């Protein structure tokens, strides 16, 4: 996993070439959204707990999953769910800043689906909560930054599905 800049430079370096027009355009696009990504990350970092709390309220709180017999019924399981969702939000933010979703493969998704299945964690409910995080985040950071952040949250959802 590497950031967008390193990926472009390494590609040219492996070929022993200077950056071509296409590579420079990729860098230009990355830098042109830099301020937007940093502003979004600042807002997300300052509001992470509230984002996760609101996303859980929107997607999971009043469903069967939190009632007796449900997978999130017990404080310990509920806390584990909150912890996982916070982790996904944090790593999606890192990936957004880097401009590269492959960070998520290595740090989040490798073996996660298998682990969830072996522990009986409902993947569908998790994906639903991640989509709620996407919605809450977009309402907080604005449409353009929300769309950018959504790329990385969708990447996690797809990796779990």
Curated annotation (Swiss-Prot):
Gene Ontology cellular-component terms for this entry are: phycobilisome; plasma membrane-derived thylakoid membrane
What Pfam families would the database entry show?
Phycobilisome
**Domain of life (superkingdom):** Bacteria
Q: What is its main location?
A: membrane
Compartments in which it is found: Cellular thylakoid membrane
Positions of post-translational N4-methylasparagine modification: 71
List UniProt keywords, sorted A-Z.
Answer: Antenna complex, Bile pigment, Chromophore, Electron transport, Membrane, Methylation, Photosynthesis, Phycobilisome, Thylakoid, Transport
Chain sites annotated for binding (2R,3E)-phycocyanobilin: 81
Topology class, membrane: Peripheral membrane protein
Could you give a single Gene Ontology term from the biological process aspect?
A: photosynthesis
Question: How does it get modified post-translation?
Answer: Contains one covalently linked phycocyanobilin chromophore.
Assembly and interactions?
Heterodimer of an alpha and a beta chain.
Family, similarity comment: Belongs to the phycobiliprotein family.
Entry's PANTHER family? ALLOPHYCOCYANIN BETA CHAIN, PHYCOBILISOME 32.1 KDA LINKER POLYPEPTIDE, PHYCOCYANIN-ASSOCIATED, ROD 2-RELATED
Q: What is this protein called?
A: Allophycocyanin beta chain
Q: What is the protein's species of origin?
A: Anabaena variabilis
């Amino acid at each position: 996993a590497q950031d967008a800049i390193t990926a472009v430079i390494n590609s040219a370096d492996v070929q022993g070439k200077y950056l071509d027009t296409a590579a420079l355009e990729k860098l230009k696009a990355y830098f042109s959204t830099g301020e937007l990504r940093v502003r979004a990350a600042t807002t997300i970092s300052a509001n992470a707990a509230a984002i996760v709390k609101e996303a859980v309220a929107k997607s999971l709180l009043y469903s069967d999953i939190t009632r007796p017999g449900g997978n999130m019924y017990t404080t310990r399981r509920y806390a584990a769910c909150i912890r996982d969702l916070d982790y996904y939000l944090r790593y999606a933010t890192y990936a957004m800043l880097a401009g590269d979703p492959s960070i998520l493969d290595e740090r989040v998704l490798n073996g996660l689906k298998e682990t969830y299945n072996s522990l009986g964690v409902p993947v569908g409910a998790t994906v639903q909560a991640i989509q709620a995080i996407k919605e809450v985040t977009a309402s907080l950071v604005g449409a353009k930054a929300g769309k950018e952040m959504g790329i990385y949250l969708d990447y996690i959802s797809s990796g779990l599905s």
